[in-house]
Amino acid sequence: MTTIVCVRKDGKVAIGGDGQATLGNCVEKGTVRKVRRLYKDKVVTGFAGSTADAFILRDLFEKKLELHQGHLVKSAVELAKEWRTERSLRKLEAMMIVANESEFLLVSGSGDVIEPEFDVLAIGSGGNYAKAAALALLRTENNLSAKEIVAEALKIAGDIDIYSNHNHVIEEV
């Protein structure tokens, strides 16, 4: 369980996640890094779900990025197709948000590759809280950057969701 949120504002895309890993009802670690840079630091990914499954998917996505020379949409679609059709991958329990400087997408094991409608995507147990907070901040007149909106949304989600904490990693592309 976790919170991953991605926001686009003023030509910048920021993605962030909390650091909590749980095993059953216990917090096992509070400093897990769920947001990572890939493909020459031009792509950022954030994962929610089983840690081992997320690492498998991240590695597969990185291979797709290399194969398709960093083309985000093509790589995400190819990953979703393989994830959906490859028997050994079908049972992986994770979701991911992938982003570059101009696009970001939600990729799921059910074959979904979704571009956001309102410049916000969020996944994980705290995803709905973070999405609502980010949307509210985007719709309010303020001088907050995409990165600052992500930070505030993660803070709010961490206050509400017991499976998310306040140890955040935020990357901007």
UniProtKB/Swiss-Prot annotation:
Na(+) binds at G158, D161, S164. Allosterically activated by HslU binding. It comes from the Bacteria. Its main location: cytoplasm. Its EC number is 3.4.25.2. The active site is at T2. GO terms for cellular component: HslUV protease complex; proteasome core complex. It catalyses: ATP-dependent cleavage of peptide bonds with broad specificity. Keywords: Allosteric enzyme, Cytoplasm, Hydrolase, Metal-binding, Protease, Sodium, Threonine protease. CDD domains: protease_HslV (cd01913). One of its GO terms (biological process) is proteolysis involved in protein catabolic process. It is found in: Cytoplasm. One of its GO terms (molecular function) is metal ion binding. InterPro entries: ATP-dep_Prtase_HsIV_su, Ntn_hydrolases_N, Proteasome_sua/b, Proteasome_suB-type. A double ring-shaped homohexamer of HslV is capped on each side by a ring-shaped HslU homohexamer. The assembly of the HslU/HslV complex is dependent on binding of ATP. Protease subunit of a proteasome-like degradation complex believed to be a general protein degrading machinery. Belongs to the peptidase T1B family. HslV subfamily. This is ATP-dependent protease subunit HslV. It comes from Glaesserella parasuis serovar 5 (strain SH0165) (Haemophilus parasuis). The gene is hslV.
